[in-house]
Amino acid sequence: MSDINATRLPAWLVDCPCVGDDINRLLTRGEK
């Protein structure tokens, strides 16, 4: 994966509701 794709990946995840929910769930569980 190129640096450009790596940089745009977070924004792409946010644009995808399904994946975004999974990421938010992982982040919330990680913080706890």
UniProtKB/Swiss-Prot annotation:
UniProt keyword S-adenosyl-L-methionine present: no
Sequence position, cross-link 2'-cysteinyl-6'-hydroxytryptophan sulfoxide (Trp-Cys): W12-C16
InterPro entries in the cross-refs: Amanitin/phalloidin
Post-translational modification: Processed by the macrocyclase-peptidase enzyme POPB to yield a toxic cyclic heptapeptide. POPB first removes 10 residues from the N-terminus. Conformational trapping of the remaining peptide forces the enzyme to release this intermediate rather than proceed to macrocyclization. The enzyme rebinds the remaining peptide in a different conformation and catalyzes macrocyclization of the N-terminal 7 residues.
Keywords per UniProt: Thioether bond, Toxin
Signal peptide bounds: none
Cross-link (Cyclopeptide (Ala-Pro)): A11-P17
One Gene Ontology term of the molecular function aspect: toxin activity
Propeptide span(s): 1-10, 18-32
Family: Belongs to the MSDIN fungal toxin family.
Function: Major toxin that belongs to the bicyclic heptapeptides called phallotoxins. Although structurally related to amatoxins, phallotoxins have a different mode of action, which is the stabilization of F-actin. Phallotoxins are poisonous when administered parenterally, but not orally because of poor absorption.
Protein name in UniProt: Phallacidin proprotein
UniProt organism field: Amanita pallidorosea
